Amino acid sequence: MSGVRLDKIVKSYGSTVAVNDVSLDIREGEFLTLLGPSGCGKTTTLRLISGFIQPTSGAIHFGNKDVTGIAPQHRQIGMVFQDYALFPHLTVSENIGFGLVERRYDKAAIKKRVDELLALIKLEEAADRYPSEISGGQAQRVAVARAVAHPPSVLLMDEPLGALDLKLRETMQTELRRIQQELGITAVYVTHDQAEAMNMSDRIVVMNAGIIEQIGSPKGI
C-alpha cells in the first residue's frame, strides 16, 4: 500500500487536452473519489494512474517511486471495472485466486488467501459457484476480492457500481467502503454520481474540462 502523487499531469490527444496540468496527492490508506460529468477527465486520470495510458507531460509517483512510463503489470495495482470481467468457467474461489496462481503462489498460500477474502466479502457459501450462479452485487464483490488478492499498492475502481440497480448500488457502496477500510488500502474511485461520492469518500476531487475544480471532504464540498 502506498500514497499516489500526480505532478503537473497533462494528457493530450492531438489538439484535445483531456487532462490539463493536474497535481494531486492521494494519501496512503484513503478512499479518494474523482467526481465529474462525462468527458471531464476523471477516467483518463484513473487510466494514467494505472499505466494503461502515459501522460504527455508530468510525473506519477507511488510512494517515493516514480512510476511514470512503467507498465500496469509492474505498478502493483488492483483494478475493478463496471464490467466485472469474471472468468465464466472458473468458480468464485478460482476467480479470486487466479492472480495468485499466475504469480506462482503455492497451493496452501492460495487457499489461505482465498478463504480470507471469501470471509471478508461474506461469500463463503458461494465459493464453489460459477459467476452465472451469483447476483450482480456478489459478482462485484468477487471482482474486488480478485483485485486485492495479491495486495496492491493502490486499488483503482472505474464506476464499478454503474450496472447495478439503485438499492443494490447503495448496499454495495457500504460494502466497498467496509472492504477498503478493513484492508487499509489506498483506493481511487471514479463516478459521476454525487451521492455515491458523498457516501463513500474520505475526500472528493471534483473535475471538469480536464482540470481539478475543487478538493475536499464530503462535508466540505
What are these regions (language model features)?
Residues 43-46, 142:
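ABC ATPase nucleotide-binding domain helices that frame the ATP-binding cleft
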Residues 50:
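Helix-to-loop junction immediately C-terminal to a conserved catalytic motif
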